[in-house]
From Swiss-Prot:
Residues 79-90 have a biased composition (Polar residues). Residues 78-269, 281-316 are annotated as: Disordered. SMART domains: Col_cuticle_N. The lineage of its organism: Eukaryota, Metazoa, Ecdysozoa, Nematoda, Chromadorea. Nematode cuticles are composed largely of collagen-like proteins. The cuticle functions both as an exoskeleton and as a barrier to protect the worm from its environment. This is Cuticle collagen 7.
Length: 316
């Protein structure tokens, strides 16, 4: 088999493989699009189920909240009859409660009353008569206007007749100086000059001093000192470091017991708030946790379906 035949066969096989790869890519792309559309549809259905469940929980929570608020009011009325101590006054307001659920849509209003009839229209002209302009007599002439701008320059006139017998005129003034000429050739070298007179020998100023020489060798030791008396005392040395801290001292004697204090005044505590706000917070948090748990379960189901679909596609 020749090389040309082998190359042509390999090129044909390569083209078939590339064509098959393109077809498989197109199928995979279409499968991915269908999977994404199915996922969006399932997510929309799940969102609808979640909204319905949330609305049902909100409505149920509203009924429970109303019943608890009624019971709380009765309990508060019963507790208000207790005369346990001095009632508090000027107590600060508690924290604001959570926003309530949105109310139902109101009913449509009744149609308004009919308007009053309008005023009768005004009739327009039936026909139009053509009128001629009034002819006025001619008036007096107006004042003279401002002088106009000078006109443009006229053309040159014709040349005059030639002069007759005037003679030669006087000479004109001298003309300007001409430009410099080109440089001339170099001249011949001159003769050598006569020798000059001998000069007087000068004497310059002394130069600066040189650098100091190297240090010489040490000298011989000196003679021993006279007398056996000690020399004078030297200057005092620097202060030494601080010493170690000493041992702690013994404890003192206990003091005498103090006198009894006077009884304090009434604290005037504020009354406890109703339990409706606390229970409302707990119910809302519990419902939110349940809804978030349902969302997580639904997301896990969708992810599991995606994995199963991908495995089926790979096996196919």
């Amino acid at each position: 088999m020749s090389s040309a035949t082998f190359l042509s066969v390999m090129a044909g096989l390569s083209g078939i493989v590339v064509f098959g790869a393109l077809i498989s890519v197109f199928h995979i792309y279409s499968d991915i699009n269908s999977f994404v559309e199915d996922s969006h549809r399932e997510l929309g259905e799940f969102k609808g189920f979640a909204n319905d469940a949330w609305n049902s929980m909100i409505n149920q929570d509203d009924s429970v909240r109303m019943a608890r608020s009624v019971f709380g009011r009765r309990r508060q009325k019963k507790q208000s009859q207790c005369n346990c101590g001095q009632q508090a006054s000027n107590c600060p307001a508690g924290p604001p409660g959570p926003p309530g659920a949105s109310g139902d849509k109101g009913h449509d209003g009744q149609p308004g009353q009919a308007g009053k009839p309008g005023q009768p229209g005004v009739a327009g002209p039936s026909h139009h008569q053509k009128q001629e302009c009034i002819k006025c007599p001619q008036g007096l002439p107006g004042p003279a206007g401002v002088p106009g701008q000078p006109g443009p320059k006229g053309p040159n006139g014709n040349p005059g007749a030639p002069a007759q017998g005037g003679g030669q005129g006087p000479p004109g003034p001298p003309g300007p100086a001409g430009s410099a000429g080109s440089p001339g050739q170099a001249g011949a070298p001159g003769n050598p000059g006569s020798p000059g007179k001998s000069g007087q020998r000068g004497r310059g100023l002394p130069g600066p001093s040189g650098a100091p020489g190297p240090q010489g060798p040490p000298g011989a030791p000196g003679q021993p000192g006279s007398g056996n008396a000690p020399g004078p005392a030297g200057p005092p040395g620097p202060a030494g470091p601080n010493g170690q801290p000493g041992h702690p001292g013994q404890d003192g004697q206990p003091g005498a017991p103090g006198n009894d204090g006077t009884p304090g005044s009434d604290a005037a505590y504020c009354p406890c708030p109703t339990r409706s706000s606390v229970l409302r917070h707990r119910n809302v948090n519990r419902h939110r946790a349940a809804a978030s748990k349902k969302r997580v379960v639904a997301k896990k189901r969708v992810a599991k379906k995606r994995v199963v679909a991908a495995r089926r596609h790979v096996q196919a």
